[in-house]
């Protein structure tokens, strides 16, 4: 969850001003507290939310937020969940925003709902009420709540709300340097009909959805079977292009198809692969940086290599 600023403790609430029957001395009358409430964002709020996002994250262009909100508008979402996320309003004017990406999955034959919070911003004078949106989001129906890009100053806040780390750092791998495993081939999403092995409807949808959002998505297969892969283009220190792993069925698939995947990404100008996890990627040259971009969850944690339908893949943060 990107955070524009450090909010006060989410549990802190401003005490309402006490209104007495008569003034004490010459004290100025105390202003009444603003009428605050948290509620789900609706289509009617989009213009106001867009302004808040541009205000809170000025380094991102306005078009980025247009695209993100339009993507949320077009997505299928589980019943009873918010399409866009939550806002805080004061006197019916939006003063805070928290976007949420909520998705239904079939994982290992079991239906599950996963929700990822993103882009948390509250105007400075209302920052003591930032936790209202967090509470609203955590009341929404989900089996897993994700915060994949928390700002460091929010670690303690989300830990107080029951979040725990499911990754502690970032692995950097060079799959193109692997020489074994020849014979595998890569099929882009527009060539899935050529696959020798069945591509399930869920895998096909996942690949197409992330490709449409700007990811490098493809199917890789060898003589034994095929697997989907999704990566997102990133930049290390604004100079070195790299590919962040967004999705694979099993992290061992990255090792199994390392040579084919690495060469395909190399042709896209992406020699380095980033994997959020807790150790190096086994069987691929690289390093692991501990305590670098840790990710948090509440509820059932996703497995390593599954950031599907999160801000990492859909928004490109």
Task: State the predicted function of each range.
Residues 108-171, 239-294:
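Acyl-donor binding region in acyl/amide transferases
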Residues 86, 96-98, 115, 120:
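Conserved GNAT-family N-acetyltransferase fold
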Residues 4-6, 12:
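Short hydrophobic alpha-helical segments enriched in small aliphatic residues
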Residues 21, 49, 57-85, 89-92, ...:
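Amide-forming acyltransferase catalytic core, primarily the GNAT-like/NAT-type
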Residues 16-29:
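Short acidic N-proximal helix/loop "leader" segments that mark the beginning
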Residues 291-317:
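C-terminal functional modules
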Residues 92, 100-107:
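Acetyl-CoA-dependent GNAT
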Residues 35-49:
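A short beta-loop-alpha structural element at the N-terminal edge
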């Amino acid at each position: 969850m990107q955070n524009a600023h450090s909010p006060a403790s989410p549990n802190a609430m401003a005490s309402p001003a006490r209104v007495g029957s008569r003034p004490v001395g010459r004290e100025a009358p105390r202003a009444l507290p603003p009428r605050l409430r948290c509620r789900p964002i609706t289509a009617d709020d989009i213009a106001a939310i867009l302004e808040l996002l541009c205000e809170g994250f000025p380094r991102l262009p306005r078009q980025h937020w247009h695209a993100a909100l339009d993507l949320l508008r077009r997505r299928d979402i589980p019943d009873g969940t918010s399409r866009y996320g939550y806002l805080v309003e004061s006197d019916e004017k939006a003063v805070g925003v928290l976007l949420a990406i909520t998705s239904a999955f079939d994982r290992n034959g079991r239906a599950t709902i996963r929700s990822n919070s993103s882009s948390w911003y509250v105007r400075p004078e209302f920052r003591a009420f930032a936790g209202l949106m967090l509470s609203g989001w955590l009341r929404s129906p989900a089996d897993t709540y994700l915060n994949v890009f928390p700002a460091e100053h929010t670690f303690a806040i989300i830990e107080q709300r029951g979040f725990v780390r499911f990754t502690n750092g970032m692995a950097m791998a060079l799959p193109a340097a692997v020489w074994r495993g020849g014979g595998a081939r890569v099929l882009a999403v527009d060539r899935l009909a050529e696959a020798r092995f069945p591509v399930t409807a869920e895998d096909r949808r996942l690949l197409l959805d992330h490709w449409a959002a700007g990811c490098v998505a493809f199917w890789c297969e060898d003589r034994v079977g095929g697997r989907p892969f999704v990566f997102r283009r990133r930049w290390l220190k604004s100079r070195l292009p790299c590919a962040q792993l967004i999705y694979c069925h099993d992290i061992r698939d990255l090792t199994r198809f390392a040579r084919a995947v690495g060469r395909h990404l190399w042709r896209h100008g992406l020699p380095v692969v980033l994997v959020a996890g807790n150790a190096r990627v086994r069987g691929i040259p690289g390093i692991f940086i501990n305590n670098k971009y840790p990710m948090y969850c509440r509820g059932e944690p996703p497995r390593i290599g599954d950031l599907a339908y999160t801000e990492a893949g859909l928004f490109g943060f």
